[in-house]
C-alpha cells in the first residue's frame, strides 16, 4: 500500500470519527432540548427542577413561551446533525447560542443566587460543550479543506 492511500485512509477514518462525534453531540443536545422544552411547555414553572411553591403567573407565562424556542432549537440541532454534510455551516452558531445560554445561567446565578443543584452541571456543560463542538467543527472543516486541496476528495492524487 503506498503512502498516498494510507494518508487518505487515515484522513477518512479521523474525519468519520469527528463527524460522528459531532453528530452525536448535536443529537444529544437535540434530545435534551426537545424533552426539557416540552416538559416546561406542558408543566410550566412547576416542571423546572428545584421549583417549589406557587409561581407568579408572569414567570410561568414567560417560561412556557420561551420553552417553544428551546424545542425549536432542539429540532434545529436534529436537522443539522441529520444533514451535517450540507448544513455544517450552522454548527458554530449552535455552539454560540448554547454558550450564550450558559452565560445567561451564570448571570442569573451571580445576580439572584445558585439554582437547583441539577442545573449547575447543566451550566458547566453549556460552557464546555460549545468549545468541544466548535473544535470538532473547525478540525472537520480543516480536514475537508486539506482533502480538497490535495485531491483526496476525488480519490486521485497528482
Each language-model region and where it sits:
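Juxtamembrane helix-break-helix junctions at the cytosolic face
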Residues: 75-90
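Hydrophobic alpha-helical membrane segments
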Residues: 91-105
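Membrane-helix boundary connector in multi-pass membrane proteins
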Residues: 103-120, 138
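Core segments of alpha-helical transmembrane spans in multipass integral membrane proteins
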Residues: 31, 35-39, 59-79, 96-100
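Interfacial segments of alpha-helical transmembrane regions
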Residues: 17-31, 87-94
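Membrane-helix boundary elements
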Residues: 19-25, 32-60
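Non-cytosolic membrane-interface motifs at loop->transmembrane helix junctions
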Residues: 52-60, 114-125
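Membrane-water interface at the C-terminal end of transmembrane alpha helices
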Residues: 127-148
